[in-house]
């Protein structure tokens, strides 16, 4: 095991503070409407220019192991805020820096670190409760656009396109962000339920100009096994042919003579049919088949529930207004499922989202929820260069997270004003002893730091602005973009309550841990021996040169 270097007390905390300040100073330059850019060098290709706090934080590694620990802990603050609300990383970093700097001064002055932390935690809980009281629901499209605009560093076009996407697919709908091919941002919306499986044979295509198979008013046969024997399918095919309706078969697979017979029947016009593989794998496939069954008012033909293909009747089949199959995707439009059953299924998926601890599972469940509840919108980001594209895409993703958070927990006045107004909750708050009171006072000063930093980045005097904002009340604040004071909500400067809350909680959590640090352990740097002179072989016979 490699030898370790151990630092204690003040010398450990001083080193850690250097790392905290290096990372926070780089990140906080990006805060607010007049935040500056940070250029990140890449080992290959052009450097990246960004105003996204978490992107800057991720790039920073320091040479000194103890300083690096401080930097990595602040990076953890940014990623914690990002995980909780998808935004607010820069605000969280600024708050953490203020808490750690003030806290370590108090520790150096002889305060008890544990009591300081208790005071900070008590004050944080009170501020979080006050933020909840300050928040207003974010229901209309205008408010959603304003939140998106602020989060995308005051880019109106991004806020508007996100609001439009949410309007079209609903609050539960999936909105994905992709790189576009033009200069402008574009929005495309897929109505109905779409899954990434296409037709099993090109012979099902009935629109050769677009290479799609379109079925009007089809019946849907949902089967959770492979179909290779046509005899199993005959009873259903005959019943469908009598009904004179098209048929879509969604099964684990359709192969061999079963697929060949379906193709022949389709080409001869005996029965209009198309087949597609069921989406997903394993248990997820079963769940998605059940989703399609609920959406279309059908039943999955499964031996697990005692149903077989031979005994299937028209009552077991789902109904839809239209189905479109391309080579890669299948879209079911206007399924005939009962609203009450769809709502019950949505509720069940929501409960699973709450319970799961896996990010991957959560993402897949969100997709299933969207397919049942709303639809899918794709925002294609347009930009002039590759560098701009990456930067813009990161901002669109941030704005999207922020608007979702706003819909979830409401909005508060932006520009750091909400935290200043939430100070009211801790003006008279008292701890159990004097050291806890110092912790509460410390947080009282720290919550002003985002407002001060936004002002400093705009080139104004932070103390003057902070005092004027504190003298005001309600939504009164400072618009750093225009240099004016006024009602922040009327000026369209809104922050999601969830983002502000998550930023403060992440900063207080890690800030409190850093204040209570007493020892730090790191690997000793290895002393590499100086490289020797290379062998001068082949240089013999030079004796006569003297």
From Swiss-Prot:
GO terms for cellular component: cytoplasm. Keywords: ATP-binding, Chaperone, Cytoplasm, Isomerase, Nucleotide-binding. The keyword Flavoprotein does not apply. It is found in: Cytoplasm. ATP binds at residues 30-33, 51, 87-91, 415, 479-481, 495. Its EC number is 5.6.1.7. GO terms for biological process: protein refolding. InterPro entries: Chaperonin_Cpn60_CS (IPR018370), Cpn60/GroEL (IPR001844), Cpn60/GroEL/TCP-1 (IPR002423), GroEL-like_apical_dom_sf (IPR027409), GROEL-like_equatorial_sf (IPR027413), TCP-1-like_intermed_sf (IPR027410). It is an enzyme of class 5 (isomerase). GO terms for molecular function: ATP binding; ATP-dependent protein folding chaperone; isomerase activity; unfolded protein binding. Its main location: cytoplasm. It catalyses: ATP + H2O + a folded polypeptide = ADP + phosphate + an unfolded polypeptide. HAMAP family: CH60 (MF_00600). Belongs to the chaperonin (HSP60) family. Forms a cylinder of 14 subunits composed of two heptameric rings stacked back-to-back. Interacts with the co-chaperonin GroES. Together with its co-chaperonin GroES, plays an essential role in assisting protein folding. The GroEL-GroES system forms a nano-cage that allows encapsulation of the non-native substrate proteins and provides a physical environment optimized to promote and accelerate protein folding. This is Chaperonin GroEL. The lineage of its organism: Bacteria, Pseudomonadati, Pseudomonadota, Gammaproteobacteria, Pseudomonadales. The gene is groEL.
